[in-house]
Amino acid sequence: MKNKLHRVGRCTASSSRWLYRHVNDPFVKKAKAEQYRSRAAYKLLEIDEKFNLIRKGFVVLELGSAPGGWSQVIADILNGTGRLIAVDLADMDPISGVEVVKLDIELQRKELYEYISGVELDVIVSDLAPSASGSRVTDSISSIRLAELVLHYAKNSLKKFGTVVTKILRGSEDEYRFVNSLRKQFKKIEYFKPDASRKASREIYLILLGKLS
């Protein structure tokens, strides 16, 4: 039996194409069936399956957590142990075992550092992405700026030998400068694009393993 394709209503050509892809996306359907808040949950599931980053008892900081797909995955892995601090300026419905902190990670750094003061983080994860500008290079540079912000928190709050997962968009020379700057900070750097990432997407995840100091 052939899978049914959902039809979309009348709208602009670009939004119609996006909506068509979205409603017929197998990961969107799977997320709905398995009660994940977003298809992005499967990206983290793939990342963790490959790299075994999050373990029971770990303390995890998630930056840019709304709507909560990644938070659900991490909370399931921790299973009532450790601690998950999920930070986003956008509203996010509560999840059992998750500390939801509403603030701007760029403009309210002092407040976040006060919140995590004295906390030894095992892992920092981020699925942050910039608003699309229409320029491949601009979007890539903006994504790297967000990743640099994630690394700012890692430098100050991630324990030695800790791990960072952060996303960038490929398409600018800044990527190579940024990644090269990390080689003195982490023992190993891996690039990973999950199957759950759309083929046309330029997103790639940097898996930064073994903070050196």
From Swiss-Prot:
Keywords: Cytoplasm, Methyltransferase, rRNA processing, S-adenosyl-L-methionine, Transferase. GO terms for cellular component: cytoplasm. GO terms for molecular function: rRNA (uridine-2'-O-)-methyltransferase activity. It is found in: Cytoplasm. The active site is at K167. It catalyses: uridine(2552) in 23S rRNA + S-adenosyl-L-methionine = 2'-O-methyluridine(2552) in 23S rRNA + S-adenosyl-L-homocysteine + H(+). The keyword Transferase applies. It comes from the Bacteria. S-adenosyl-L-methionine binds at G68, W70, D88, D104, D127. Pfam families: FtsJ. The keyword Nucleotide-binding does not apply. InterPro entries: RNA_methyltr_RlmE, RNA_MeTrfase_FtsJ_dom, rRNA-MeTfrase_E, SAM-dependent_MTases_sf. It is an enzyme of class 2 (transferase). Its EC number is 2.1.1.166. Belongs to the class I-like SAM-binding methyltransferase superfamily. RNA methyltransferase RlmE family. Specifically methylates the uridine in position 2552 of 23S rRNA at the 2'-O position of the ribose in the fully assembled 50S ribosomal subunit. This is Ribosomal RNA large subunit methyltransferase E.
